[in-house]
Amino acid sequence: DESGFLEEPVLLTNTHSVGAVYEASIQWRRQRGYHPQDAGQGWASLPVVAETWDGRLNDIHGHHIRAQHVFAALDQAHAGRVEEGNVGGGTGMVCHGFKGGIGTASRLLPGGDTLGVLVQANYGRREDLQITGVPVGSRIRGYEMSIQQPSPYQGNSIIVVIATDA
């Protein structure tokens, strides 16, 4: 039987750090006592690790994320407001030719439950940017990023985490 509950951290990182973040999350959970003492080999940790390619603004091949960084992030995790913008996994993001990052939004639903969304934006060409149907991206000139290394990939990515307290 599945519980339907997410019991693991949700971690966001760059493409080449998925393995390091996944392994460190399991180590952190074991060291912090999340591994039931009587579970023996029957306990498994299945962290959720999502990635975006940040090679335009980051030395992605440097493998800079280490276990101590993951431990620090998990130890500092807290309820309430989260940092947004150029932080954590959002540090190397580019969105529609602008510096991207992490953003959030939430709504109080009828009945008192909250729906929250966290987005790590790393997609889109400037000329494709539209706001309420207006093609503003094609009208914006002179605000190009100083680093214009093109992505070697045709596609781009966005991570959307949706959660509720219902």
Model-derived regions, located:
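Alpha/propeptide regions of enzymes that mature by internal proteolysis
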Residues: 1-166
